[in-house]
C-alpha cells in the first residue's frame, strides 16, 4: 500500500525560474491497484514518480509504503522494494552484459549475494522460465549482450528485471513512449500480464489516452502540480477517450499535448 500525504516540491525556489512542480498531492494506492496517470506537460507526473522513488526529496509531506515512512530514505534504499521503468529503453540495463547477467543483477537486489559469486544453475532455470513468459524468444539468447536487443525487447527485459524479485511498488514512467505503436502494444500486454499475475501495486504514467482507460483499475488526472481527479468504478468502466478528453478540458488548467490526442 502506498500513501502520499500532502507532498510538495518546488524547483529553483526564490528565483525568477521558480517552478511549483507538486502542490499538496495526496494519493493512496491499495495493494494490487494498477493506477494510470495522465496530464499535460509540466503537470508534475514525472516529478511525483521521482519523489516516490527517491530521485528527488519532497519539500514537505510524507510517503508511506506498506506502513513504513520512506520519506527520507535514499533512492538506493527504496530501490530494494520499488521497481521502475523509464521512457528510454536504454535505461535500466547494462548493455555490455548478457541477458543472463542482467537478470542475475536484478535477482540479487536486496540480497547479500552478488554477481561476482556467480549465477547458480537453479537461478538460470528461473530466468529461462520467466523469459519464456515474454514470448520474445529471449530464453534462447541468454548469453547475448543486451546492447544487441531491439528497443522493445530491451524494455520487456527491463520490465522483467524490475519485477523478477516482486517489488512492493512498480513505477512505469511512460515506458512505451519511445517504441513504435505495434511494439508498444506488445510491451503493454506483457506489462498487464506481469502486473496481474503478481498482483503488483502499480503506478503508470502514460502518453496514450486509450491506454489510460484500457489498463488498470483507476485513472488519475494531474494538472499544474495538483491531482485533480480520480476516475474509478462505474465511471471508469463507462469512460471513453472522448469523455476523458472533455473531462480533462473542463477541469485542467492546461491542455493535453497533440501527441497524447493523436495516440487515441
Question: Which residues make up each language-model segment?
Answer:
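Conserved ABC transporter NBD signature motif
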Residues: 61-68, 231
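Helix-to-loop junction immediately C-terminal to a conserved catalytic motif
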Residues: 53
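A short, flexible loop at the N-terminus of ABC-type nucleotide-binding domains that lies
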Residues: 1, 10-24, 74
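ABC ATPase NBD coupling module
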Residues: 15, 19, 69-83, 91, ...
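The feature captures the beta-strand-to-loop junction immediately N-terminal to the Walker
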Residues: 38-40
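H-loop/switch region of ABC-family ATPase nucleotide-binding domains
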Residues: 206-207
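ABC ATPase nucleotide-binding domains
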Residues: 237-264
Amino acid at each position: 500500500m502506498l500513501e502520499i500525504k500532502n507532498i510538495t516540491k518546488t524547483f529553483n525556489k526564490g528565483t525568477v525560474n521558480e517552478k511549483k512542480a507538486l502542490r499538496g498531492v495526496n494519493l493512496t494506492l491499495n495493494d494490487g491497484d494498477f493506477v494510470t496517470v495522465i496530464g499535460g506537460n509540466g503537470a508534475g507526473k514525472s516529478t511525483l514518480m521521482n519523489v516516490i522513488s527517491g530521485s528527488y526529496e519532497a519539500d514537505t509531506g510524507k510517503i508511506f509504503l506498506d506502513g513504513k515512512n520512506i520519506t527520507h530514505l535514499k533512492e538506493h534504499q527504496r530501490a530494494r522494494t520499488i521497481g521502475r521503468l523509464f521512457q528510454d529503453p536504454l535505461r535500466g540495463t547494462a548493455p555490455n552484459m548478457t541477458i543472463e547477467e542482467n537478470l542475475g543483477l536484478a535477482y540479487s537486489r536486496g540480497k547479500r549475494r552478488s554477481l561476482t559469486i556467480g549465477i547458480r544453475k537453479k537461478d538460470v532455470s528461473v530466468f529461462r522460465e520467466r523469459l519464456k513468459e515474454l514470448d520474445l524468444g529471449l530464453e534462447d539468447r541468454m548469453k547475448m549482450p543486451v546492447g544487441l536487443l531491439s528497443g522493445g525487447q530491451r524494455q520487456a527485459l527491463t520490465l522483467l528485471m524490475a519485477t523478477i524479485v516482486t517489488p512492493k511498488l512498480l513505477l512505469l514512467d511512460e515506458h512505451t513512449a519511445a517504441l513504435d505503436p505495434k511494439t508498444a502494444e506488445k510491451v503493454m500486454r506483457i506489462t498487464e500480464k506481469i502486473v496481474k499475475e503478481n498482483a503488483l501495486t502499480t503506478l503508470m504514467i502514460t502518453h496514450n489516452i486509450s491506454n489510460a482507460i484500457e489498463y488498470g483499475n483507476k485513472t488519475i488526472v494531474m494538472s499544474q502540480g495538483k491531482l485533480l481527479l480520480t476516475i474509478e468504478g462505474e465511471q471508469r468502466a463507462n469512460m471513453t477517450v472522448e469523455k476523458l478528453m472533455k473531462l480533462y478540458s473542463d477541469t485542467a488548467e492546461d491542455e493535453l499535448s497533440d501527441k497524447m490526442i493523436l495516440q487515441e
